[in-house]
C-alpha cells in the first residue's frame, strides 16, 4: 500500500505516475500526519509492516502511533539529505535503493 499526501483531486494522476515507475500498488490519499492513517490501515493486520518516507516528521508520526511498524527514513535527494533532521523512530536509514532493499529483506529474514 502506498500512503501519499497527494490531494484527492489528483489521486488518479498519482496512480498513473506510480504505475509508470513500476509501482502498481494500491494508493491511499492522505492529509496531514500519517501516523493515524497507518494505525487505521494496520488495525486488523498481523504481519510485519514497514513505513518508508523521506519526511522525518512523518516517520516520527508513524513511529509514535505504530510501535510495531519498522520505520524507515529514506531520501534519494542528495541535495536535501545533509539538511534533514534525524527521524525519531527510524530504525533503518538506508543510503541507496539497493541498501533499502537489502535492509528490508534482512528484517523479514530476522522475523522468520
Predicted regions: what they are:
Residues 1-15, 27-30:
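Substrate-recognition element of Asp-dependent hydrolases with the DxDx(T/V) motif
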Residues 10-11, 35-38, 58-60:
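Short, well-ordered alpha-helical microsegments
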Residues 26-32, 89-100:
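Short acidic-hydrophobic, aromatic-tinged amphipathic segments that line or gate anion-handling sites
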Residues 35-40, 80-88, 103-105:
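Short, charged, surface-exposed secondary-structure boundary motifs
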Residues 38-44, 98-111:
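Short amphipathic alpha-helix with an adjacent loop that forms part of the alpha/beta core around
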Amino acid at each position: 500500500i502506498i500512503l501519499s499526501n497527494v490531494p484527492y483531486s489528483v489521486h488518479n494522476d498519482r496512480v498513473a505516475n506510480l504505475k509508470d515507475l513500476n509501482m502498481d500498488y494500491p494508493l491511499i490519499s492522505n492529509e496531514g500526519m500519517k501516523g493515524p492513517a497507518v494505525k487505521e490501515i494496520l488495525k486488523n493486520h498481523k504481519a510485519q509492516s514497514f513505513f518508508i518516507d523521506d519526511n522525518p516528521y512523518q516517520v516520527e508520526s508513524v513511529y509514535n502511533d505504530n510501535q510495531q511498524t519498522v520505520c524507515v527514513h529514506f531520501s534519494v535527494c542528495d541535495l536535501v539529505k545533509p539538511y534533514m533532521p534525524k527521524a525519531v523512530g527510524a530504525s533503518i536509514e538506508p543510503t541507496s535503493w539497493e541498501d533499502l532493499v537489502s535492509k528490508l529483506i534482512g528484517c523479514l529474514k530476522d522475523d522468520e
